[in-house]
Each structure stands twice: as C-alpha cells, then as structure tokens.
Amino acid sequence: MSARARAASGQPSLPSALIGHSAGGQFLTRVAAYAKTDATRIVVANPSTWVLPSVQTAVPYGFKGMPDSEPLLRAYLALPITALLGGNDTGTNNLSSEPEAVAQGINRLERGRATFEKARAIAQQHGWSFHWTLAEVPGVGHDSTKMFSSAQATAAFGL
C-alpha cells in the first residue's frame, strides 16, 4: 500500500509511518513482528499486549511457531519502533486477560516498559541492532487524543 501511494504521488522516497493506539497499537506490534514493512517510523501507543521478543513464547505473543523465528525477531528489534506509553495508563478496563497477556504485566504501562526492557536486553545479548525508543507521557492514561497531541508523540513522529 505504501509503495502504491509513493508511486501515485510521484515521490518514490516518500517516508511512511505506522501509528496505532490501544487495539491499533496491538495490531501494529503484530505487523511489525510478522510482516515486512518499509515504514520509517512505527509508533505503538498503549497496546493491551505486545509481541514479546521471545522465540520461547508462542504466536501471537512471541515468535515460537513462526518459520525462521530468530531472523524475524532480529528484524523486529531493528525496526524504528517507539513505545509511546501513558504514564497513568494503569487501569485494567478492556485489558487483555489471557494468561500470556497477564504474564506481560498487570497494566498497559507495565507491559510496555517490560517489553521494551526485554527487547533491549535480547538485542544486547545477541549483539543485534536495536532501534526502539521508549517515551512516556506523564499524567496521561488511556487517551489517544492526549497521547498523540503530546510533545513525546511529536518527537516520535519526527515533527
């Protein structure tokens, strides 16, 4: 789709970004983990769950069961992902409660922080490229308008 938009615009090097909040952010973690993307920025805000950087955790929460799971994991960690987290996104309304989700943490903020730290540690352990960033928006809960109008989002969008 991005290639089509670039061709139609006559700008073959036009950058593209993937941005999602809540369920949209959760979907983006799956896109980033399991599909090829040429996005120059991927901003994942407050998802209920993440794709963990683990070949021992089964799909859709990790890479176990995917063909070529380790190369996929390596590519995932090299993507330009910003984990944009609300500093007050600590509620449990509409939070995934499957055992695999609960294992990620008790709320979206905890899950995002833990996933980022695990991703950084795995990349460092293997000597792989790691292009993720973590940005927290203080005082904001599960609110896409406040998240995406924050200075942290502006920076994540490269504006």
Residue spans for each PLM region:
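Extended hydrophobic secondary-structure segments that form protein cores and membrane-embedded regions
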Residues: S16-H21, V43-A45, W132-V140
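Catalytic phosphate/metal-binding cores of nucleic-acid and nucleotide-processing enzymes, i.e., regions
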Residues: L18, A32-A33, A39-I42
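Short glycine-enriched nucleophile-adjacent loop
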Residues: G25-K36, S149-A151
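Gly/Ser-rich "nucleophile elbow"/oxyanion-hole loop immediately N-terminal to the catalytic nucleophile
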Residues: M1-A23, F130
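Short, internal active-site loops enriched in acidic
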Residues: A23-G25, N88, P138-D143
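The feature captures the conserved acid-bearing segment of alpha/beta-hydrolase catalytic domains
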Residues: T40-Q124
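Extracellular/periplasmic catalytic domains that process cell-envelope and extracellular macromolecules
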Residues: G10-P12, A35-T37, L73-A78, G127-W128
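C-terminal catalytic histidine-bearing segment of alpha/beta-hydrolase fold enzymes
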Residues: S96, F116-L159
